[in-house]
Swiss-Prot record:
Pfam families: DNA_methylase
Catalytic activity: a 2'-deoxycytidine in DNA + S-adenosyl-L-methionine = a 5-methyl-2'-deoxycytidine in DNA + S-adenosyl-L-homocysteine + H(+)
CDD domains (UniProt xref): Cyt_C5_DNA_methylase
Name of the featured protein: Type II methyltransferase M.BbvI
Domain SAM-dependent MTase C5-type: 3-347
PANTHER family, sorted: CYTOSINE-SPECIFIC METHYLTRANSFERASE, DNA (CYTOSINE-5)-METHYLTRANSFERASE 1
Enzyme Commission designation: 2.1.1.37
Gene: bbvIM
Keywords, sorted A to Z: DNA-binding, Methyltransferase, Restriction system, S-adenosyl-L-methionine, Transferase
Entries under Gene3D superfamilies matching the protein: DNA Methylase, subunit A, domain 2, Vaccinia Virus protein VP39
PROSITE patterns referenced in this protein's UniProt entry, alphabetically: C5_MTASE_1, SAM_MT_C5
Species: Brevibacillus brevis (Bacillus brevis)
């Protein structure tokens, strides 16, 4: 069975690569369950080019680049056909725990509603929605519950929801990246999705394992030239430390009095997963090597996100950095998407309880769990 998949907010293709690699063959019937790319949309031109280059080089027109608010949703079906699956990692800017919380009143918060419009128009069998862990605390939990209710009632049939806070380091991603992923299966389907059991809960993949043996001529592997003072400061920061380390001489310390973010000039620890790879932020937020006094290259950042070395990101260095930081780790996505395929194949797989039971979750419960995000 092939699930033809559409995607909004596709970015450079992290979810799409996970879907492309996800496959399951039924042991008794031999039937193959897999996803097939139908169409995708994103507003970022460079991300669209990256997606086209790696996911659908033979069908570049299937990536519609433009503002989702101006997208002709009906024409997608007319041009590319019906879809059985739908994925969307709706923009997280207004829900992130880094910076000001805006939630439903922000510029990006309402964009999830375009995913609901796709569900209303095409009624796919299954959808997967992704957002940052901070979504659960936005607007005192009301944003999260509102989104869940809208998704559950979408389309002709409605959807059975399984929302869960995935800690991707527990699924083989060498990075502490926590994201809410909501899997919805159409209510007329007599199958039930369960959260796949973590694969690496006892032994995380480390930063040093992930960044080993990168070829010098690897794609997107340009090094950053730092000022002498930055190099000297990094030399005084131990692995896992940051710009506020007591070991830094006074003359090399940052002249910042009010805000002290832990990510500033923070070095990776070689024996632990990386901290979260981000797509935005100014100087000092690029992620720093534990041994060499320098920022990580984009290829190193892509490795931490589990993109293969032949996955080429298109655009200038800062544009590539943004794409990588905003993506869903393909390896983590693959595990979740294969669980979806096994669900429809009616195959049992190792699973755990979801963080929230949608039928009974309340705003109060959501707020009580906020401290578990990071």
């Amino acid at each position: 069975m092939k699930f033809r998949k559409g995607e909004l907010f596709c970015g450079p293709g992290g979810l799409a690569l996970g879907a492309k690699e996800a496959k399951y063959m039924h042991p008794e019937t031999g039937e193959v369950f897999e996803f097939e790319h139908a169409w995708a949309n994103d507003i970022d031109e460079w991300a669209c080019e990256t997606f086209r280059t790696n996911i659908c080089p033979d069908r570049p027109d299937s990536v519609v680049c433009g503002d989702v608010r101006e997208l002709d949703i009906k024409s997608l079906g007319e041009k590319f056909g019906e879809i059985d699956a739908f994925t969307f990692g709706f923009p997280c800017n207004d829900y992130s725990i880094v910076g000001e919380h805006k939630g439903m009143e922000g510029n990006y918060g309402p964009l999830y509603s375009y995913g609901v419009k796709i569900l209303n128009e095409y009624n796919p069998l299954v959808f997967i929605a992704e957002n940052v862990g901070g979504l659960q605390s936005a607007n005192e939990g009301k944003a999260f519950l509102g989104i869940l209710n809208d998704l559950a009632s979408a389309g002709k049939y409605g959807y059975k929801l399984v929302p869960h806070l995935y800690k991707f380091e527990e699924y083989g991603v060498p990075q502490r990246r926590h994201r809410i992923i909501i899997v919805g299966i159409r209510k007329d389907q007599d199958v039930a999705f369960r959260v796949p059991e973590p694969t690496h809960k006892e032994k995380y993949r480390t930063a040093s394992e992930a960044l080993a043996d990168i070829p010098e001529d690897a794609l997107n592997h340009e090094f950053t030239r730092h000022k002498k003072k930055v190099v000297e400061m990094l030399n005084h920061i131990a692995p896992g430390g940051n710009a506020w380390s007591e070991s830094i001489p006074e003359e090399l310390r940052l002249n910042v009095k009010k805000v002290r973010m832990s990510q500033i000039y923070r070095r990776l620890h070689p024996d632990q997963p990386s901290y979260t790879v981000t797509g935005s932020g100014g100087g000092g937020t690029h992620g720093y090597h534990w041994e060499e006094p320098r920022a990580l290259t984009n290829r190193e950042r892509a490795r931490l996100q589990t993109f293969p070395d032949d996955y080429e990101f298109i655009g200038k260095k800062e544009m590539v950095r943004k794409q990588i930081g905003m993506a869903v780790p393909p390896d983590g996505a693959k595990i979740i998407l294969e669980a979806v395929l096994k669900t429809f194949a009616r195959i049992e797989y190792p699973s755990i309880n979801s963080k929230w039971d949608f039928e009974s979750v309340s705003a109060e419960q959501v707020i009580e769990e906020v401290q578990e995000i990071m």
